[in-house]
């Protein structure tokens, strides 16, 4: 409602900032938030209005160049693990149950992978009672699907069918961005319109990758019950853990310093400067940073569950 049809959003925002006599703008968000802030700053400069913009990179997706770590990513992984730690107990309620844990991550599998690592570390501390059918196998992760790794559905279905037959259940960690291209192709072939947001991103909550995969895997695995649970809001609404709080504190203190010195940029851990926390030129900020799926710890997880990598 702030920008009427035909108006330039940058001009509308700039004029409002000028009317309010704002000369320092702190932006907190992901790549879209901070690249738009940079455009706003440049627009105002071109129109003889000095605005200092200092951004903080808050996104659980952890998909921003050139950052080593984004604010909230550690917490999101920890909370996603806690979420699944509760949800997975549903495996006791029926036979041949398929549980899909859908994790945030449009173009980046970092959060799904890190959440899986956190979950595995937590489940190691649990006590199981196989004689009461409370076996650690049924609490284990059987597949992890992320945007960075393509996979053959038929081969995976065959592998998971064997697991379902053996342990009476299958647990999948699915990045919300995994397989999106396949879903889009199917929708377009059916003449369906692809819903997109203001930034041109596909609205993942509307095309619902979790349900799409659930429908196909459920049939292929002869699942008697299928449960799809998204940890996104649970993780996003959680209070920051200690690691994130310390990074937030350090980042905010630097952000205030740079703002008072009238220096614009994004405060973050620069991967090109050995992870040092400093002011990064907005022009270097880009989204869609992929997860390095060749990281040893992640390869070890996939190898342990028999999934191709």
Regions found by a protein language model. Give the residues of each.
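Acidic/polar active-site rim loop that often engages polyanionic ligands
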Residues: 56-69, 93-96
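Short, ordered loop/turn segments at secondary-structure junctions
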Residues: 30-31, 56-62, 149-150, 176-179, ...
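C-terminal non-catalytic interaction/assembly regions of soluble proteins
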Residues: 179-309
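Short, amphipathic alpha-helical "lid/cap" segments that border enzyme active or binding sites
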Residues: 10, 14, 77, 81, ...
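Glycine-rich oxoanion-binding loops at beta->alpha junctions
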Residues: 1-23, 32, 60, 71-73, ...
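Accessory alpha-helical/coil subdomains and C-terminal extensions
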Residues: 16, 27-29, 35-50, 70-224
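Short beta-strand elements at the ligand-binding edges of bilobed clamshell
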Residues: 64-77, 239-245
């Amino acid at each position: 409602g702030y920008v009427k049809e035909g108006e330039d959003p940058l001009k509308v925002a700039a004029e409002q900032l000028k009317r309010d006599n704002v000369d320092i703008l702190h932006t907190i968000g992901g790549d879209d938030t901070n690249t738009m802030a940079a455009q706003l700053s440049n627009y105002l400069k071109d129109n003889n209005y000095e605005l200092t913009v200092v951004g903080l990179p808050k996104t659980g997706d952890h998909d921003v160049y050139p950052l080593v770590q984004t604010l909230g990513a550690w917490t999101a992984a920890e909370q996603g693990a806690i979420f699944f730690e509760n949800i997975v107990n549903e495996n006791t309620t029926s036979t041949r149950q398929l549980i899909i844990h859908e994790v945030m991550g449009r173009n980046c599998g970092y959060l799904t992978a890190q959440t899986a690592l956190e979950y595995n570390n937590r489940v190691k501390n649990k006590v199981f009672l196989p004689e009461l059918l409370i076996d650690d196998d049924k609490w284990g992760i059987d597949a992890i699907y992320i945007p960075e790794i393509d996979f053959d559905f038929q081969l995976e279905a065959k592998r998971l069918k064997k697991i379902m037959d053996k342990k009476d259940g299958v647990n999948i960690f699915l990045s919300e961005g995994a397989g999106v291209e396949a879903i889009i192709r199917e929708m377009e072939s059916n003449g369906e319109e692809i819903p997109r947001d203001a930034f041109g991103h596909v609205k993942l909550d509307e095309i619902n990758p979790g349900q799409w995969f659930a429908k196909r895997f459920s049939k292929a695995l002869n699942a008697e019950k299928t449960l799809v649970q998204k940890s996104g809001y649970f993780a996003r609404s959680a209070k920051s853990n200690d690691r994130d709080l310390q990074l937030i504190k350090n980042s905010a203190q630097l952000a205030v310093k740079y703002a008072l010195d009238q220096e614009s940029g994004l405060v973050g851990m620069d991967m090109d400067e050995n992870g040092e926390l400093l002011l990064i030129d907005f022009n270097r900020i880009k989204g869609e940073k992929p997860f390095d799926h060749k990281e040893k710890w992640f390869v070890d997880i996939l190898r342990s569950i028999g999934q191709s990598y």
